[in-house]
């Protein structure tokens, strides 16, 4: 299954997470029923091309056991692995035990990151880690001056890089257009992790940017926000300003 077939949720707290999961499930419902006094007619199941998962960073203050119990309670089965749950220097035995623990909860680790890379040594470490973990997607934040070296690593390891954007909070990769301008002429395995909330807080139209750059969108972080400015706050899906019903339609249209 292609790594781009997963959507990551990047929510701040448990209440927001629960609301977001419920709202998105409603938006992507696969079965509808029409009832009468004598019969129930079910429409054919529509299989989605994408799945809802969890950004490991959402559980930065929680251990792996708590994280997995929460995912099970939310009926979520995909996790982007963060290094505070599986350290960058983990050996094969530790990685195997980690994957088994995820499997015990019905969870699959589909990517690693975000991993920040400020030197060539950190680029090497990040890609070697992704290979040992056994994933084909690395969510990363390499310094601009390292992109030539990162491109070599992408080719060497045959691992996709999804550069994570930061919105107005950091000067490094503030929005989708900035990432696009830095990867458009590079190896096609170099793309972005589109954080639709951060992107909008920078003043960029996240839905329009998805349409423009969808061929290089390998992962997404989902959050609603209250305003298209730095002052915008995270909000439960449906309580902010992002048009999620239209967003889901776009994911289907462009076969995310």
Q: Where does each model-flagged region fall?
A:
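Glycine-rich, proline-tolerant flexible connector loops at the mouths of alpha/beta enzymes
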Residues: 80-97
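Solvent-exposed, acidic/flexible segments
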Residues: 60-64, 91, 120
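Non-membrane alpha-helical structural segments and their capping/turn regions in soluble enzymes
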Residues: 92, 96, 120, 124, ...
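Active-site beta-loop-alpha junctions enriched in small/polar residues
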Residues: 55-59, 82-86, 114-117, 143, ...
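Active-site acidic/histidine proton-transfer and metal-coordination neighborhood
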Residues: 10-11, 16-21, 44, 65-66, ...
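Catalytic-core regions built around general acid/base machinery
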Residues: 94-104, 149-156, 246-250
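Pocket-edge positions in alpha/beta enzyme catalytic cores
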Residues: 59, 87-90, 171, 236-239
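Histidine-acidic metal/acid-base catalytic patches
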Residues: 2-51, 60-77, 131, 176, ...
